[in-house]
């Protein structure tokens, strides 16, 4: 084992205590996430819950419990959001920036495993195969030590480390053993510096969420005048008693609030999370499902995303004139079996040639970075070496030129040769006889090609970026069907506009630094692209955080998993199309659901305004002011089968239609005209059926029932057009909703509990006639709207 002069038995307990007191310990700042209390407050104290909560208290004050059924929505809205966010928080909190590595720390008091936060400056940390480097340091002992820094730099090849070399936190040992002295701890360590920029809690962009918030804000402005007018007219002009006035007032205000829209959106996202969870895909922010469906550029990190860790033997090219009695396959299998600490290349050879001949080893020479070869002397089977062709061969030889030609294609080439002396001889390997060229390539994920083909069909462009050399990146991209010249990122322009223009001309980029990955994301976003970034290393963290959607591999660095919105726990790139599919389902279905809820809001506001204006006009004209037609129970049952249950089913249904921008415009061009028709039709029926404030209780109930019949007919027709294009289950849903109301009106107990009376044939006939006219108007509007938006109207799929 090579030791540096600085290798020691480690720190004393007093030296450790002194460094802790001086703040020179490995305290890593925790990632900032919302606390449980903040999550609860954010989901309970919402604008909608506040409005509904006040109205619920008012209704309960009247003693009418059945009219307070809408209060259940407050609980449902809050619980679903809290459960999902707390679940994501718990997952995030488990993903520490440096991970749960337990380094083996050597001190004068003894050598034992310790937590990463126990490490202090100048500690001696021992390393073996698979160990993670938890802090930056300097190698003080090494025995054929090779470090994989791909999570930090993107460079796929393991790096041989000698005494005095630097090792960085976030890398890990591939082969060999050694020890290093901690030179940078805590926030000074390389991985911690990158992670610090990704430590703040952020929310992914969401057109659905932003659009719904804009709509809710607009509705709030409408609620104020409509609500004040309703409160005044129902409490101070109708003179029917405070309980009846309060119930009518609440009956007017409750349906104005699209309370179920937020609930159904949360449910649709939550179900998407569960479905993707079954595919080993962790969604850490609900709207990330939607975001990936809108992505038009995917920046895919090569190492760890498109390729797997390790190498694969793709070809063994035997050289002319290398006649030996031993077969090349037997020699390679014997070499692999004799290597106690195989590096990535020898592991690939062992996988390809897994039937060793059982030769007896006479001498063994492990791989060293200084010599670039390893070898074994076998009893009765000669001396064999394998290593870099440019070291073992004459550069002018045919074999050397052949190896150079293959290497120029982005492949790794090793020379298998017979040596003239034993491998442990001072002059080893002596004169070598070339026998074969062993060609290795990075393992491409078996599902990567299929996934990239899917994105191509969906008009999503893919940019392959890596810290590896450009030739290697280009070779992998070419194997995956992404043809074109690869660019060395060291030649990329620094200006955002120039960089964006360059990105349009190239598909693959090598030698990309972490800050350049972030700059690439920013440049693409500046040209209006929605960018997804996939990666698994600490070097990907900054780009993952700033991309519209960050996707990390489950086997990647804890830092990359912590900042990504989506984590592929099974490391399968092919999971992404399923995420896109879930996003499309959410977007398409929530758009349908939003049409239903906002139509209800429009007709509720309009009906309240019409009744309120009539009350104001009636006072100077000495006419009876109108009571609002509905009590809270009426609007509750009206929502059951025209909105609530159908919306729930529609929000979960399969839907693979492409996502397009313009959510608010499309929804409002349906909801506003449909809502106006329903509001006017309901008001006309009620006006015709209303018998005045001195009417009997039965007559008032008949007028309210007539208005409800018209509302149900027109609202059901809105459901019928929103559910198009029909499939058998959508048509069945519409028919079942209509049948449910027929059953309610047919059952005496239901009529009694829900305050319904359709026994007056005159008012009921008026309600039916106006309902038919309203439904026909909605049908005509649907056809006209489709033409105006340039969409072909389809009744059947």
Swiss-Prot record:
Q: How does it sit in the membrane?
A: Multi-pass membrane protein
User: Where in or outside the cell is it found?
Assistant: Cell membrane
Keyword ATP-binding listed? The answer is: yes
Any idea of its EC number? 7.2.2.10
Active site at which residues? 301 (4-aspartylphosphate intermediate)
Q: Please verify whether the record's keywords include Ribosomal protein.
A: no
Catalytic activities = Ca(2+)(in) + ATP + H2O = Ca(2+)(out) + ADP + phosphate + H(+)
Q: What parts of the sequence cross the membrane?
A: 55-75, 215-235, 254-274, 601-621, 633-653, 667-687, 703-723, 729-749, 764-784
Give UniProt keywords alphabetically: ATP-binding, Calcium, Calcium transport, Cell membrane, Ion transport, Magnesium, Membrane, Metal-binding, Nucleotide-binding, Translocase, Transmembrane, Transmembrane helix, Transport
Query: According to its UniProt record, where is this protein mainly located?
Result: membrane
What are its GO cellular component terms? Answer: intracellular membrane-bounded organelle; plasma membrane
- Select a single GO molecular function from the record's annotations and give it: ATP binding
The cross-references to InterPro entries, in alphabetical order and at most eight, read: ATPase_P-typ_cyto_dom_N, ATPase_P-typ_P_site, ATPase_P-typ_TM_dom_sf, ATPase_P-typ_transduc_dom_A_sf, HAD-like_sf, HAD_sf, P_typ_ATPase, P_typ_ATPase_HD_dom
Q: Which family does it belong to?
A: Belongs to the cation transport ATPase (P-type) (TC 3.A.3) family.
Its job: P-type ATPase involved in specific uptake of calcium.
Q: Tell me the protein's name.
A: Calcium-transporting ATPase CtpE
Query: Could you tell me which species this protein originates from?
Result: Mycobacterium tuberculosis (strain ATCC 25618 / H37Rv)
